[in-house]
Structure formats: structure tokens, C-alpha cells
């Protein structure tokens, strides 16, 4: 298994490219994180009250600095999602493997932040596909868990795509969906 924190792979398919988020992505990502329609779908659990709604380039740059520091400290990987048809960043996806003495042991925890116009079932399936295929090898995880609030109907449908993964409710939190292969 390659160490994702030493060499972060570029992932993708015909529609989307996922590459580690860098400072140069800030301007385009600001369009995502200033999208008021998108913010309610962002998972900000354990983020010290940050809801990821940013209005300035400086705020976005500061967040990317944090993501880069988190990568260097092996906390998580954050990829920018590029729409191949436009070449522009349309969101980010974060992942890490959680080791714990509970239901989520060896679980890859995933956060997906998208511009609101990309909150469509087929688009989300296409974005998730390359990462879910590689997650066990990249992170050593046995399953993947993410959150999708009830209002995120398209996202919830995408998390039920017939792709070989089994989707189950994540215990006591009705917004958490877990995927197991």
C-alpha cells in the first residue's frame, strides 16, 4: 500500500479530476464556499464551529493553509474536485481513516463539499467513484462513512448507487450513511 500522506495520487474519471488542494485553488474554491445554497450540505462536525461559509479570499486561503498543515501532520487528505468540461474547481472532498474502539474503527470518514449546481445524483456518483475504488488501498480502511442531511435528497440517492458498495444507516445519527464493500 502506498502512503497517501507521502504521495497523494491524482484521481479521476472522464468527468472529474481530484487532486490535492493547493493554494492556487483558492479563488475557484471561494465560489464553492461562498455558495449559500451549498453550505447547508457541508459536514462541519468536529470543526470547532466553522460552517465553511467564506466571503473573502483571505478566509479561503487561511482554510487551505489549515488543510495543507493537516495533510502534513497526516490528519486528512483534502482533494479539489475539478470539472473536466470547464477545468474549474467545483468542490472538495476530504478523507481519513479513523481508528477507534467503536463502530467506526478502520472507517474512512469522508466529507464532500460541492457547488450547489453539482448536487445531483449522477454527478455525485461520478465524483465519488474514483475515491471509493481506491479508499481501502489508500487509507487502509474497511468501510467509508459520510454524512448527508435529510434535505440533501440528491446526495442521499447518490449514496445508494448500485456500484458494489452496501449503504447502511450509521447508527444513532440519521444523517450519517456508511458504505461497506
List where the protein language model places each region.
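GNAT-family acyltransferases
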Residues: 1-117, 134, 138-141, 149-154, ...
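Conserved acetyl-CoA-binding loop-helix of GNAT-fold acetyltransferases
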Residues: 121-134
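Charged, low-complexity surface patches
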Residues: 124, 148-149
Amino acid at each position: 500500500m502506498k502512503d497517501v500522506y507521502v504521495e497523494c495520487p491524482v484521481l479521476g474519471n472522464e468527468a472529474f479530476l481530484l487532486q490535492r488542494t493547493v493554494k492556487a485553488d483558492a479563488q475557484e474554491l471561494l465560489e464553492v464556499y461562498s455558495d449559500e445554497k451549498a453550505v447547508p450540505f457541508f459536514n462541519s462536525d468536529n470543526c470547532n464551529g466553522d460552517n465553511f461559509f467564506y466571503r473573502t479570499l483571505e478566509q479561503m486561503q487561511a482554510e487551505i493553509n489549515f488543510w495543507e498543515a493537516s495533510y502534513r501532520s497526516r490528519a486528512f487528505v483534502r482533494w479539489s474536485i475539478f470539472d473536466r468540461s470547464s477545468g474549474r474547481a467545483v468542490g472538495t472532498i476530504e478523507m481519513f481513516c479513523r481508528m477507534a474502539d467503536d463502530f467506526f474503527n478502520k472507517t474512512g470518514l469522508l466529507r464532500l463539499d460541492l457547488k450547489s449546481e453539482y448536487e445531483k445524483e449522477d454527478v455525485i456518483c461520478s465524483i465519488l467513484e474514483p475515491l471509493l475504488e481506491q479508499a481501502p488501498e489508500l487509507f487502509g480502511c474497511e468501510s467509508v462513512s459520510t454524512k448527508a442531511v435529510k434535505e440533501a435528497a440528491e446526495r442521499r440517492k447518490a449514496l445508494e448507487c448500485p456500484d458494489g458498495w452496501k449503504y447502511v444507516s450509521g447508527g444513532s445519527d440519521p444523517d450519517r450513511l456508511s458504505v461497506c464493500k
